[in-house]
A protein has these predicted regions:
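Aromatic- and Lys/Arg-enriched surface recognition patch
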Residues: 64-135
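Short, charged beta-turn/beta-strand-edge "cap" motif at the junction between a beta-strand
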Residues: 53-60
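Hydrophobic/aromatic beta-strand segments within beta-rich folds
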Residues: 46-51, 100-102
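Hydrophobic beta-strand signal
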Residues: 51-52, 67
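Compositionally biased, charged N-terminal/linker segments
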Residues: 1-46, 144-145, 152
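Long terminal accessory segments
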Residues: 133, 137, 146-148, 152
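A broad, low-specificity signal marking well-ordered, structured residues that form hydrophobic/aromatic
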Residues: 3-4, 26, 99-100, 135-138
Length: 152
């Protein structure tokens, strides 16, 4: 099993939106970065665990735990001219972007803020806490996962 962190802006699609979905499950669409796409397409597997992270908000931090319930498949929002994620270079025959389906397992007991995560030497190699990392999808080691659950 692999571990991940996926960022979202709560004003666009946050934990409350996912919790309100049927079966607390939805597709994770709109990722438009090749490195993040490759992780979703090639590395995310059924059962992988994912931290849900709220970004671009008053208190950025980890707010929930999700599970990958469908492996990577073409992101249909790229083909929709009305979608904010439309990409005219992506087609059903030659998809450029991929998504996975995730299910909300549970909210974390509290928001675990980025400011707190940055204080722990155990997390210094985590991409989230390194300067300049803007990826919306990133790997988390098993040790980092367990440590974060321990401070929850």
């Amino acid at each position: 099993m692999n571990y991940w962190l996926m960022k979202t802006e709560p004003s666009v699609y946050g934990i409350d939106h996912l919790a309100a979905e049927p079966n607390r499950t939805d597709h994770w669409d709109g990722v438009r970065n090749y490195q993040a796409r490759n992780m979703m397409r090639d590395q995310m597997k059924l059962g992988d665990q994912v931290f849900l992270y709220h970004s671009n908000c008053k208190e950025p931090g980890i707010v929930g735990i999700m599970e990958v319930v469908r492996e990577g498949y073409p992101d249909h929002t790229a083909w929709d001219p009305e979608s904010r994620y439309h990409d005219p270079k992506s087609t059903p025959d030659n998809p450029r972007w991929f998504m996975v389906d995730v299910k909300l397992v549970r909210p974390t007991r509290r928001t675990i803020p980025l400011t707190e995560l940055k204080r722990f030497p155990e997390l210094e190699d985590m991409p989230l806490v390194r300067k300049g990392n803007r990826l919306s999808v990133m790997p988390v080691t098993a040790e980092q996962w367990d440590f974060i659950l321990g401070i929850e």
